[in-house]
Curated annotation (Swiss-Prot):
Organism this protein belongs to: Campylobacter jejuni subsp. jejuni serotype O:2 (strain ATCC 700819 / NCTC 11168)
Enzyme Commission number, as recorded: 5.3.1.16
Family: Belongs to the HisA/HisF family.
Gene name of this polypeptide: hisA
Protein name (Swiss-Prot/TrEMBL): 1-(5-phosphoribosyl)-5-[(5-phosphoribosylamino)methylideneamino] imidazole-4-carboxamide isomerase
Family annotation (SUPFAM superfamilies): Ribulose-phoshate binding barrel (SSF51366)
UniProt entry tagged with the keyword Cytoplasm: yes
HAMAP family per record: HisA (MF_01014)
Catalytic residues of the enzyme: 9 (proton acceptor), 131 (proton donor)
Length: 243
């Protein structure tokens, strides 16, 4: 069954939203991250997603203390991402009580290290974030979306799915933080070619209709801005996906 996965992006402990990953286009929300996550959990969310934007910019400033507090205080699964560049960071996050760690650019830039991490921590602990841009084909972006790689999305998926990959988080960058609706076509395509991979859709969720369109295609739909802005609630999202 498709789950709604509420998401928070944090800079220095503050809840923020960026548009298309741009730190200059930042909106700060006056929410306490722990209270917000507890609210989402109480509403019925089974998984939560956290992006450490401080750590993404500077790994030496990763918000470990806050992440550990959040992981310990919520009883549902917490998944964390944000520019994770090393095996040590993955281990440290899992030691904090995080259920899954999201790794991105590393999958493209250092496949050897990425495979080592998959092998060492297991496919249930790792989510590959593949941020895509449509050129002539879907290609994977790296470096916090600032550049397109020469790697085609389907080729990357083919490579890793043969090496035991189970979970991906796929974002259509053109949609992220825009609330323009999700790219259903992209997720359908992945689901048809790689039926055994659990897809988390992210970017552009603007209405319950988007959730409805992804039902049965994705294992999870990450929702940030739409929940923070009160477009719909976690309860409404769960009901929509259950029907």
């Amino acid at each position: 069954m498709t789950q709604i996965i509420p998401a928070l992006d944090l800079i220095d402990g503050e809840v923020v939203r960026l548009v298309k990953g741009d730190y200059e286009q930042k909106k700060v929300y006056k929410y306490n991250p722990l209270k917000k996550f507890k609210e989402y959990e109480k509403a019925g969310a089974k998984e939560l997603h956290l992006v450490d934007l401080t750590g993404a910019k500077d790994p030496s400033k990763r918000q470990f203390a806050l992440i550990e507090k959040l992981a310990k205080e919520v009883s549902v699964n917490l998944q964390v991402g944000g520019g994770i560049r090393s095996k040590e960071e993955v281990k440290a996050l899992l030691d904090c009580g995080v259920k899954r760690v999201v790794i991105g650019s590393m999958a493209i830039k250092d496949a050897t290290l990425c495979l080592e991490i998959l092998k060492e921590f297991g496919s249930e602990a790792i989510v590959l974030a593949l941020d895509t841009i449509l050129k002539e084909d879907y290609v994977v972006a790296v470096n916090a979306w600032q550049e397109a790689s020469d790697k085609k999305l389907m080729e990357v998926l083919d490579f890793y799915s043969n090496k035991g990959l189970k979970h991906i988080l796929c974002t259509d960058i053109s949609k992220d933080g825009t609330m323009q609706g999700v790219n259903v076509r992209l997720y359908k395509l992945i689901h048809e070619i790689f039926p055994n991979i659990c897809i988390q859709a992210s970017g552009g969720v603007a209405s319950l209709k988007d959730l409805e369109n992804l039902k049965g295609i994705c294992s999870g739909v990450i929702v940030g801005k739409a929940l923070l802005d009160g477009v719909f609630s976690v309860e409404e999202g769960i009901r929509c996906l259950a029907n």
